[in-house]
Amino acid sequence: MSDIENPAGDTRPIGVFDSGLGGLTVARAIATALPHESVYYFGDTKRCPYGTRTEDEVRSFALQAGRWLSKHDVKIMVIACNTATAAALRLAQQVLDVPVIGVIAPGARAAINSTRTRRVGVLATNLTIRSGAYTRAIQDLDAGVDVYGCPASSFVEVVEHELASGAHLQEQWLENEDIFDTPAVRALVGATVEPLRDHGIVALHRQLDAHYAA
């Protein structure tokens, strides 16, 4: 959570916004890294998933969430939704009266740090892929990394909302494995990452690494 500044003496809460419940993993990470902070969470479960929404709709939803969090006097807003980060981060930073950060930049840094072949595959919602947000974020940090985007809204929806068993999630993953026809060893899933650990995707990552390293 190095992207969150913590001014001394500012006891206001940190606001976290997501399209559903997946962002609770981000809230937990903040609580672990900054145990003395309070966190307010806004999960838009009524209108999720965002991956099938238009960009204008997602922007509107993000601003509504931001204004709600502002009314609760948060000192910073974390957009814990990749789709909302891609569609609305810049607008929210311009319009809202609190600092706003998203999750794409940290995800891009993690992808660069973990790839051994300088090739990254991105599985994300159609809107996130169309925005080019991950490609820009990764190549702004390292222009030598090749980025392969794969729209996979159904897979991301399963991941973010933990709607399936491990077997179902692996099936969804394999349905989208065409992206690995290119040697994109490290897959960056445009969704909250922690739930993946419970569904065997980490093991799939290791298999991919071993395959392309061979």
What are the residue ranges of the model-derived segments?
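Non-catalytic structural scaffold of enzyme domains
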Residues: 1-214
